[in-house]
Design a protein with these regions (language model features):
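Short acidic, glycine/proline-enriched helix-loop-strand junctions
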Residues: 48-56, 65-70, 197-223
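Non-catalytic positions within long, well-ordered alpha-helices that form the structural scaffold/packing
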Residues: 30, 123, 180-181
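Extended substrate/RNA-proximal surfaces in nucleic-acid metabolism proteins
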Residues: 50-158, 236, 241-262
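Short acidic/histidine-rich active-site segments
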Residues: 184-200
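Active-site neighborhood of phospho(di)ester-bond hydrolases with catalytic His/Asp-centered motifs
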Residues: 2-4, 37-40, 72-76, 130-132, ...
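C-terminal helical cap
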Residues: 167-169, 215-243
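An N-terminally biased module of ancient metal coordination in phosphate/nucleic-acid-related enzymes
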Residues: 1-68
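Active-site environment of divalent metal-dependent phosphoester hydrolases
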Residues: 44-47, 78-80, 136-140, 164-167, ...
Length: 262
C-alpha cells in the first residue's frame, strides 16, 4: 500500500516528536503492509515549510529503514494567500514527491466564496489539488456540493483511514461511507501523527472498504491511485460523479458513466 499523507518526520510540526518515534511509526507502517510513504508536514503560519530540513529529516529516517519502506516528501498545504503566491513560481516545492499532486487542507471555520478561483489558480500554476479529509470538515459536510464543484474542475478527494473506522466520530464516518458508496473518493490515507491516536496504519480500513465496495475499489484507493500520485501519473481510477452533484445552476446534468480500471 502507498500512504500519501502522514506526519512522520520529527520536529517539523505536530507529528512525530522524535527520530525514535518516527522510526517506530515507519516500522508500524511496514508491519501493516505499507511500502511507500509520503511525509507531508504542515505548511501554515504555525509551522513554516522548510524544504531543506524536511529532506534532511527524511534522509535520516530513510537510512534507518534498511530499504523496507520508501520515503518521499510533500506537504499538507494550507490555503493562505502567502502559500499560494509562494507556490506560483515553483509548485513542486510543495507537491507530493515533487511531481504534480498537491494535498490541500481547508479551514474548519471559513471557506470563502472565492475558493473555486483559488483552486483554479493552483491548477494554472501546475498543481493538481487533492482535497484532504473533507469528511472531517464540518463546513464541507454541511455543503458537500461545493466539493463536488471542485471535483468537476479537476480536484480529487482523500479521506482518512481512521474516519472509515469511526475514530473521528460518527458524522465523519457516515460521510466517508456515503462518499465511498457513491464513488466520490480517490484516495484513503493515514494522516498519521503518532503511534497511538493517529497511527500509520491502513490495513483495517482497506479491509472495510473491500467488504463494502469490493476488492478492486480497495486496491484503487490504497494502491493504484496513491502509487500514481507518488509517480506523478494520471489516476487510473476516477469514477464519474453522480448526476446533478456539483453542477452549475441551470446546467444540463451529465449522464452517469461507469468507472474503469486500467
Amino acid at each position: 500500500m502507498v500512504d500519501i499523507h502522514c506526519h512522520i518526520l520529527f520536529g517539523l510540526d505536530d507529528g512525530a516528536d522524535s527520530l525514535e518515534t518516527a522510526q517506530k511509526m515507519a516500522e508500524m507502517a511496514i508491519a501493516d503492509g505499507i511500502t511507500h510513504v509520503i511525509a507531508t508536514p504542515h505548511a501554515n503560519s504555525t509551522y513554516p515549510f522548510l524544504p531543506e530540513a524536511i529532506r534532511e529529516r527524511r534522509d535520516e529516517l530513510q537510512s534507518r529503514l534498511n530499504g523496507q519502506l520508501v520515503l518521499a516528501t510533500g506537504c499538507d498545504f494550507h490555503l493562505s494567500y502567502e502559500n499560494v503566491e509562494d507556490l506560483r513560481p515553483n509548485p513542486t516545492k510543495y507537491t507530493l514527491n515533487q511531481k504534480k499532486y498537491l494535498l490541500v487542507e481547508f479551514n474548519d471555520f471559513s471557506i470563502p466564496p472565492s475558493m473555486d478561483q483559488t483552486l483554479h489558480l493552483l491548477q494554472l500554476y501546475g498543481a493538481t489539488p487533492i482535497i484532504t479529509h473533507p469528511e472531517r470538515n464540518p463546513l464541507i459536510r454541511a455543503n458537500p456540493d461545493r466539493m463536488y464543484r471542485w471535483m468537476r474542475q479537476g480536484c480529487y478527494v482523500q479521506v482518512t483511514a481512521q474516519s472509515l473506522l469511526g475514530r473521528f466520530g460518527s458524522q465523519a464516518q457516515v460521510m466517508a461511507e456515503t462518499w465511498l458508496r457513491d464513488g466520490i473518493i480517490h484516495f484513503v490515507a493515514s494522516d498519521a501523527h503518532n503511534l497511538s491516536s493517529r497511527p500509520l496504519q491502513l490495513k483495517d480500513a482497506r479491509e472495510k472498504v473491500a467488504d463494502k465496495v469490493g476488492k478492486n475499489v480497495a486496491q484503487a484507493l490504497f494502491e493504484d491511485n496513491p502509487r500514481a500520485a507518488f509517480d506523478g501519473r494520471p489516476l487510473p481510477y476516477v469514477p464519474e460523479l453522480p448526476d446533478d452533484l456539483g453542477q452549475a445552476p441551470g446546467a444540463t446534468p451529465k449522464r452517469r458513466k461507469r468507472f474503469w480500471f486500467f
